[in-house]
Amino acid sequence: RLKGLVESIINTYENLENFKTNASREWLLNIKGLGFESVDGILNYLCKREILVVDSYSLRLAFCLGYEFENYEELREFFQSGVESEQENLCKILEKKCELYELYQIFHALIVAFAKQSFKGQKLSPKGEEWIKILKEDL
């Protein structure tokens, strides 16, 4: 997969800088072996685009909070709109000015860290249940 991606980038964009500036989500989704999560990761982390990566951890967290989504896009748009609407407050909490793509990176990393601490397989750990209860109180 990686070899095919690199070859496609070189053949289409000639170099990484041109790719980072001009690659589209649709173009990447047409690369064999790349799905939404991988494509959004490339666009956010490599290309510094304003797109949030969501994954199975994000889905589990949303489900534990009482939300259900039909597909990846609904899940991404839900979390992405929440981060975007709170951009100013999040920057204050972090005590620095952050671009939206950076906030998406931080938010995704926090979800991953939370999930690794809170889930034992598909089930919440006792500590995870405690944290989810606190989060639900703030909703």
Map each language-model feature to its residues:
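Catalytic cores of DNA base-excision repair glycosylases
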Residues: 1-139
